Amino acid sequence: MNRLDIEKKLNEDRAWLLNTYAALTDDQLRADLTPSEHNPQNFWSALDHLAHLALIERNFAAMIRKHIAGDANPVGLRVDDNGVARSTEQIMASVHAMTEEWQITHHGKSLSEVVALGASARAVTLQLLSDLSDVQLEEVLPGAPWADGTVGGVLAANADHGRMHWKWVKDARLQRH
């Protein structure tokens, strides 16, 4: 994916996501919707789903920076730092624990505060995009299961991630009525 397409996708989908969330009432933003994958007793709200996107966007940028710096295992999901393979169950347990910690930390924030989290993460992504060469955007990010696995594809996947979480929010809201 080329630089222009990545930036357009990120900006257009971010604007769509902000408009979509802005159309919700405060009650709709804060209502318990989906059970946590880590602790099913804990429920995520629409705002929790929106805040989660900032965590993953920052993590993607950190993985890409590690790759550019020469780290052989920049994603660090499939194998640990010692090169030992992780099972899918181990990977998902680790990911769910990390996202749960983030959700608990940011639960209860206002829409404005959550939008600021996302803006900060997006700024990191756009700065990284501006720092990377066209050749680097086409490099494979070792261990990345997202998009086409390239650096550019992973950056652009942030847009798809937002739409995926919105679908979960929308579906959960429909089930409640």
Language model features: what each stretch is:
Residues 1-20:
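Extreme N-terminal tail/first-helix region
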Residues 5, 9, 52, 117, ...:
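Short, contiguous, pocket-lining structural segments
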Residues 9, 104-120:
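A short, structured beta-strand-centered segment in the mid-to-C-terminal lobe
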Residues 12, 16, 117-120, 124:
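Charged, amphipathic alpha-helical oligomerization/scaffolding segments
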Residues 12, 16, 28-38:
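Charge-rich, low-complexity N-terminal segments
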Residues 24-29, 110, 133:
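Residues that cap or delimit alpha-helices
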Residues 32-93, 123-177:
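Short, contiguous alpha-helical
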Residues 37-38, 98-106:
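A short small-residue
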